[in-house]
From Swiss-Prot:
A motif (Nuclear localization signal) lies at residues 195-203. The keyword Transcription applies. One of its GO terms (cellular component) is nucleus. Residues 1-31 are annotated as: Dimerization. The keyword tRNA-binding does not apply. Liver. This is Hepatocyte nuclear factor 1-alpha-B. It comes from the Eukaryota. PANTHER family: HEPATOCYTE NUCLEAR FACTOR 1 (PTHR11568), HEPATOCYTE NUCLEAR FACTOR 1-ALPHA (PTHR11568:SF4). InterPro entries: HD, HNF-1, HNF-1_N, HNF-1_POU, HNF1_dimer_N_dom_sf, HNF1a_C, HNF1b_C, HNF_P1. Residues 1-32 form the HNF-p1 domain. Residues 128-130, 141-147, 153-156, 201-204, 261-263, 268-271 are annotated as: Interaction with DNA.
Length: 592
């Protein structure tokens, strides 16, 4: 039997059982339908209300309404609801009928009547705002009374019940005279002085929403014919919910379902679904970016990070942070500078010609290169930096298979280079060495040839040499040509780890101008290191770089060593006469 009852009927039956009526009493009342005539008598029929013989009082009803302490309010005892004054404008028969029904409801259990009123509002999709506008009750007080059974004064309950009775008559007339005016004579706007009634907004009922959700799962963009079929189905469900015939659908009034409303519902549902999807994706992407930050310790073995280039104005801020965010979406395959065994810390570069990496070299024992050894991870923001030195160039002189080496990078521009302090976990860059004057291009050619021949000894250095060409990666940029004739050795940066930091920080800078005489001649195209003083190391050109003298003088910053050079002979040595041998053996240092 329960399956044949509607949702509203099940709620009413449950309310009867909760009110104290037992199943046996309910069955007996249904069997004795003639004696219990009140539920079967329409509220607009006043024939049996005046007699009072056929009206059965509920067991927990109140014989004489009494106002409790909780029912006291600021309105006072002489509060008269506006709707009660409107009863005087009705005909004597209608006024007597409505007053009799209201008095009868006042004798019922307030909580039970409140449930009936709430069920009626839900059945006909009537908002509580309409009750508030008509009766003058407080919105919060009315909601608490209908939902929680909060006590309400007798005068206010009489106003609520008067509206309830009048609304029943109004809706009954709407379905009886479908297609006519939806406002009755006794409840018209003109009958309520100084009160502007608002038209009720359309509200989807639960029956119609269930039909539309099922249709949305089948087809998110229904055609006009499908929407019209849904209109008929929804109106039919709304009429059955109200207990009237589907042929009286025009009596739904403002709750009548139309094709335009169905179209708007599908459009709004699609927008809501798209918004929920976007919100879920944004939340997921935010969690992914916060849960997986890229750092030197998080980089997997065998992966090569790539870096992006910022503007020159942002280079200082990026270097101050010592690391910049690595954006996978902005990476370019042409920026892969290291092999699979190398790892770098990403640091943003400038908008200059090709930006290479200044990185420490691997030790001879590659098997000891693990993820925990992060001392050989570094990248510097230098334009056209060239890393010199390979595993084969280290030679057998380094018996300690450490993974840290001393690297000197050669820049192609005479400009201020930001210095990174404390990059990674144990690496530090020192002050860059500035050359105030550039070598003439005619001097550069022999040196470039020697460096290129040296770097071609291994695949890594060959790749570095190829990437150093400003036309290899930046052929589409017109401003590359202005950097091709720049000096080759204008700047040098020294990289080391914390084990060698104490030695290098003890060096103090000084300046000395060494003249290049045009009458000097030599056969070896290189430079020789001399130790003029036991505490000063400087570069002195003992051989001419080219037959044509074009450079008159150059300046070099020298570093004074506070300790004896014998203790740190692995840093610089005056025993090499050519730049080739100097590059291959002396531009690297193993951490002790």
């Amino acid at each position: 039997m329960a399956s044949q009852l509607s949702y509203l009927q099940q709620e009413l039956l449950r309310a009867l059982l909760e009110s104290g009526v037992t199943k046996e009493a309910l069955k007996k009342a249904l069997a004795d339908g003639d004696n219990y005539a009140y539920p079967n008598v329409p509220l607009d029929d006043i024939r049996n209300l005046d007699e009072g013989d056929n009206c059965v009082q509920l067991p927990n009803g109140l014989g004489e309404p009494q106002m409790s302490e909780d029912e006291s309010s600021d309105d006072g005892g002489d509060f008269t609801p506006p709707i009660m004054k409107e009863l005087e404008r009705l005909s004597p028969e209608e006024a007597a009928h409505q007053k009799a029904v209201v008095e009868r409801l006042l004798q019922e259990d307030p909580w039970h009547v409140a449930k009936l009123v709430k069920s009626y509002l839900q059945q006909h999709n009537i908002p509580q705002r309409e009750v508030v506008d008509t009766t003058g009750l407080n919105q919060s007080h009315l909601s608490q009374h209908l939902n929680k059974g909060t006590p309400m004064k007798t005068q206010k309950r009489a106003a609520l019940y008067a509206w309830y009775v009048g609304k029943q008559r109004e809706i009954a007339r709407q379905f009886t005279h479908a297609g006519h005016s939806m406002i009755t004579d006794d409840m018209s706007c003109d009958d309520v002085p100084n009160k502007k009634m608002r038209r009720n907004r359309f509200k989807w009922g639960p029956a119609s929403q269930q039909i539309l959700f099922q249709a949305y799962e089948r087809q998110k963009n229904p055609s006009k014919e499908e929407r019209e079929a849904l209109v008929e189905e929804c109106n039919r469900a709304e009429c059955l919910q109200r207990g009237v015939s589907p042929s009286q659908a025009q009596g739904l009034g403002s709750n009548l379902v139309t094709e335009v409303r169905v179209y708007n519902w599908f459009a709004n549902s699609g927008k809501e679904e798209a918004f929920r999807h976007k919100l879920a994706m944004d939340t997921y992407n935010g969690q992914q970016s916060s849960a997986q930050p890229l750092s030197t310790h998080d980089l997997p073995h065998g992966k090569t990070p790539r870096y992006t280039q910022d503007s020159s104005t942002d280079r200082s801020a990026a270097m101050a942070n010592s690391q910049s965010t690595l954006s996978p979406s902005a990476l370019e395959p042409s920026h892969i500078l290291m092999n699979s065994d190398s790892k770098m810390v990403p640091v943003s570069g400038g908008s200059l010609p090709p930006v290479s990496t200044l990185t420490a070299l691997h030790s001879l024992d590659h098997s000891q290169h693990t993820l925990g050894q992060t001392q050989n991870l570094i990248m510097a923001s230098l334009p056209s930096v060239m890393t010199i030195g390979t595993d084969s160039a280290l030679g057998p002189a380094f018996s300690n298979p450490g993974s840290s080496t001393l690297v000197i990078g050669l820049a192609s521009q005479t400009q201020s280079v930001p210095v990174i302090n404390s990059v990674g976990s144990s690496l530090t860059t020192l002050q860059s060495v500035q050359f105030s004057q550039q070598l003439h291009p005619s001097h550069q050619q022999p040196i470039v040839q020697q460096v290129q021949s040296h770097m071609a000894q291994s695949p890594f250095m060959a790749t570095m040499a190829q990437l150093q060409s400003p036309h290899a990666l930046y052929s589409h940029k017109p401003e590359v040509a202005q950097y091709t004739s720049a000096g080759f050795f204008p700047q040098t940066m020294v990289i080391t780890d914390t084990s060698n930091l104490g030695t290098l920080t003890s060096l103090t800078p000084s300046k000395q101008v060494v003249s290049h005489h045009p009458t000097a001649h030599g056969d070896s195209p290189g430079s020789q290191l001399h130790n003029q003083d036991s505490s000063i190391l400087h570069l002195h050109p003992s051989h001419r770089l080219s037959p044509i003298p074009t450079v008159s003088s150059a300046s070099l910053i020298h570093y004074h060593n506070s300790s004896s050079p014998e203790n740190h002979s692995h840093l610089l040595s005056p025993s090499h006469n050519t730049i080739d041998s100097f590059i291959s053996t002396q531009m690297a240092s193993s951490s002790q």
